Every structure is written in C-alpha cells, then in structure tokens.
Amino acid sequence: MAKKNKNVLVRLVSTAGTGVFWVKKRNPKTQTEKLSFRKYDKVVRKHVLFKEEKIK
C-alpha cells in the first residue's frame, strides 16, 4: 500500500482584500510557522503579501 501524504494544502490569501488566493502544499512537521509570500495580485496588478489560511 502507498503511504499517506503528510503535506497539507493551505490557502494563501491576499492582504489587499481582493479575494485572490493561491493554494500551496506545506509539511507541518518541517514548516511549523505560517507561510507568507510576496506574490502578484492580478486584481490590483501589484505584488502584495499573501498570508496563510486554512482551506475550509
């Protein structure tokens, strides 16, 4: 049997408040802190900070 994947899907939501999000995989054992990336928000057409939220 195959092993169960330990990675968790998380949602990176734009701090600009536009509702744009990216979905990333994160291993909770090795990456204990929350993710935050500076990525492109296509609604505001700028690079903004994206912070981690759980996928509902």
Curated annotation (Swiss-Prot):
Ribosomal protein keyword on record: yes
GO biological process: translation
InterPro entries: Ribosomal_bL33 (IPR001705), Ribosomal_bL33_CS (IPR018264), Ribosomal_bL33_sf (IPR038584), Ribosomal_zn-bd (IPR011332)
Residue ranges the record marks as coiled coil: none
Signal peptide region: none
GO molecular function: structural constituent of ribosome
Keyword annotations of the record: Ribonucleoprotein, Ribosomal protein
Keyword Repeat annotated: no
A single Gene Ontology CC term: cytoplasm
Assigned protein family: Belongs to the bacterial ribosomal protein bL33 family.
Protein name, per record: Large ribosomal subunit protein bL33
Source organism per UniProt: Rickettsia canadensis (strain McKiel)
